[in-house]
Amino acid sequence: MIRGNDPILLTPGPLTTSLATKQAMLRDWGSWDAAFNTITRSLCDDLVRIVHGEGTHVCVPMQGSGTFSVEAAIANVVPRDGKVLVPQNGAYCQRILKICKVLGRASVELPIPEDQPASAALIEDALRRDPSITHVAQVHCETGAGVLNPLQDIALLCQRLGKGLIVDAMSSFGAIEIDARTMPFDALVAATGKCIEGVPGMGFVLVKKDVLEASQGNSHSLALDLHDQYVYMQKTTQWRFTPPTHVVAAFRAALDQFLEEGGQPVRGARYRRNCDTLVKGMAALGFRTFLPTAVQAPIIVTFHAPADARYDFKTFYAKVRERGYILYPGKLTQVETFRVGCIGAIDDNEMRNVVTAIGEVLREMGIEMQGRLAEAA
């Protein structure tokens, strides 16, 4: 894959992007220009099609990081007297709870171990114990540890019980199958700098038309008002406030490449090969994954840190970076870990190369894995 000489980002976003995506940012755009507004409209149409939401859902783009759009979705979809159940098995679930608190939306935390997925049975029990809950906010792929939560089961449960569902699909959209016809949701949130392989700076909410229409007046914020953003765009074809023009242009290029590659099935298969290659190679070095294979998403893998006293993450990170690879620190609360991402404009050859680099660093630091020095790959 052609990228240039930049370090490889093995993170859950920002990601390593293709040269074509980078080149798309070399042109300046007028934010009110018809050509730019055509790009925005085409993006929204394609994003809705990816989840088979034609006729039922619309796309509302939003400036800022993905968290801006998560907050916008909760603020608009959940009425001010609503109540949100948050199945919590990681750092990004915790962020949703914090958003609810700041917004003044009542919330209920459903604690789940960090190495286990949410389950429809646990969620149903929580919903039946508290009938005042109106919505469930579910992270699809919790990249704190890399757990893939069972979206379809949870979506069908919410539909059966008449509860609204907001999905944080930040790290799954474009890689894991999501079908609005069989996984009904009120709103689903993702962003440019994840599995479509764009650059950070814009999020988007795929929201049911009737839910969006009913959300007028719910938002606490002018800038994050999805209803107002959508209505204004429909009337004028323009963004309400200055859009991230270069980000939008790069996302159009990234989405074109996504579709040319074969869309979600092919993109997801590449990430799965990356993940499998990484896990196999790291196991040969003596590393253990934090998660069992059955719940591991092919997005980011959490590894137990070496038990050797000579291990120090900052030193380990710096030495791996010198070899051209940027890792991610762990986000777990109980055990020391680090994370390696499998997504971005990379393939399984890069995963083999990073395993080789990590093996070199272990030997340079004199770190023993399972009672022996790491062997050369």
Swiss-Prot record:
> Which keywords does the record carry?
Aminotransferase, Pyridoxal phosphate, Pyruvate, Transferase
Q: Which residues carry this modification: N6-(pyridoxal phosphate)lysine?
A: 194
Gene behind this chain?
Answer: phnW
What is the protein's given name?
Answer: 2-aminoethylphosphonate--pyruvate transaminase
Reaction it catalyzes: (2-aminoethyl)phosphonate + pyruvate = phosphonoacetaldehyde + L-alanine
**Cofactors named for this entry:** pyridoxal 5'-phosphate
Question: Which protein family is named in the record?
Answer: Belongs to the class-V pyridoxal-phosphate-dependent aminotransferase family. PhnW subfamily.
Share what the entry says about its subunit structure, partners included: Homodimer.
Example GO biological process: organic phosphonate catabolic process
Task: Tell me which SUPFAM superfamilies the record gives.
Answer: PLP-dependent transferases
Any single GO molecular-function term of the entry would be: 2-aminoethylphosphonate-pyruvate transaminase activity
The enzyme class is transferase
Against InterPro entries, the record matches this protein to: Aminotrans_V_dom (IPR000192), NH2EtPonate_pyrv_transaminase (IPR012703), PyrdxlP-dep_Trfase (IPR015424), PyrdxlP-dep_Trfase_major (IPR015421), PyrdxlP-dep_Trfase_small (IPR015422), SP_NH2Trfase/AEP_transaminase (IPR024169)
Q: Which species expresses this protein natively? A: Cupriavidus taiwanensis (strain DSM 17343 / BCRC 17206 / CCUG 44338 / CIP 107171 / LMG 19424 / R1) (Ralstonia taiwanensis (strain LMG 19424))
Role this protein plays: Involved in phosphonate degradation.
For this protein, what is the EC number? 2.6.1.37
